[in-house]
Amino acid sequence: MKHLRKCTALLLAVLMVFALAACGQKDDTAAVDKDLTVNVVSLNGTTGFGMAKLMADSKAGTAALNYSFTVETDPSNATAALVNGTADIAALPTNAAAALYNKTDGAVQVLALNTRGVLYVVTDGTESITSFADLRGKNVYVPVQNPTFIFQYLCEKNGLTVGTDITIDNTYAQPAELNTALASGEVHIAVLPEPMVTIARAANPDLTVALDLTAEWDKVAPAGSLVQGCVVVRKAFADAHPNEVKAFLDEYKASIEYLTAEPDQAGQMIEEAGIFAKAAVAAKAIPNCNVCFVSGADMQAPLTEFLTALSTVAPQSIGGKVPGDDFYCILK
């Protein structure tokens, strides 16, 4: 009888362990509200590339959350959606994220960095350019906004005074316009982002990449601090739905890892999602797009350093000041 009681007690203990494990699994599943619609805005181009696999999973019904995706060409549409509450999460240029944070008194926060530097100096072979010193006295065509601010900072760090030692020409304000002008031979030296570099070189085989501005940045600023793209979240949404935000980050990280591991398949997903028109071009450009996933405390130093650099040449581009610690959504 005593032996039987011991066996019974042991059996009950084992059953309790399995019961507790089952309860734990049930709680983890219940922690994510699949009835909640998470509204996400992606962008055309490299800032949106990392969202493609997640968008495909959502369409196939295999994503962890109930997503509603929108793809925008103009970042201002994404910021407007965040302000009016029709977007919960959005991909944005990092300077636009900082400007929105300052404008809304901290109503948005950065969840993760998704793109490092994507800018390159491209020439048509009529000029020999191997360093910033070779740009002295030259006219360089640069798209407006972030490309101009970044290039201006690099010029100044390399001892070139804009307007005196070098001319930054914004005649072709948008990358697509500049891409066409460069490929046709109207422009000889230009700063272009990927995937426009890939498109231009396919149209004109004489074009060459003279300078990788990410590598040039690392020579004059803290390495890894050229970070051009990110995803942000409305603070009110993050506060109300921390488990869903964590689930999004896990899926988004996996989506970005898939992009770099399977560029051909990812290129097709990018086209199908409406993030970029040509799958083959996207796939070819991916290795040069410096797509990344940096979240938590690891994202604060590089982004703060980048925004500090921008504040020295174009403080208005980040909303007038470098955001503080509350700019970063660091999940517990």
Place the predicted regions along the sequence by residue:
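Flexible hinge/capping segments at coil-to-helix
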Residues: 30-33, 124-139, 162, 239-243
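Bilobed "Venus flytrap"/periplasmic-binding protein-like clamshell domains
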Residues: 35-57, 132-199, 264
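Short, polar/charged alpha-helical segment
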Residues: 37, 43-77, 83, 100-103, ...
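Pocket-flanking alpha-helical
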Residues: 49-53, 73-107, 119-130, 176-181, ...
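A bilobed periplasmic-binding-protein/Venus flytrap-type ligand-binding module shared by bacterial periplasmic
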Residues: 53-54, 119-129, 225-244, 295
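Pocket-lining segment of extracytoplasmic ligand-binding domains
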Residues: 95-96, 165, 174-269
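Secondary-structure end/capping motifs
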Residues: 238-313
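Conserved C-terminal helix/tail region of periplasmic/extracytoplasmic solute-binding proteins
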Residues: 304-332
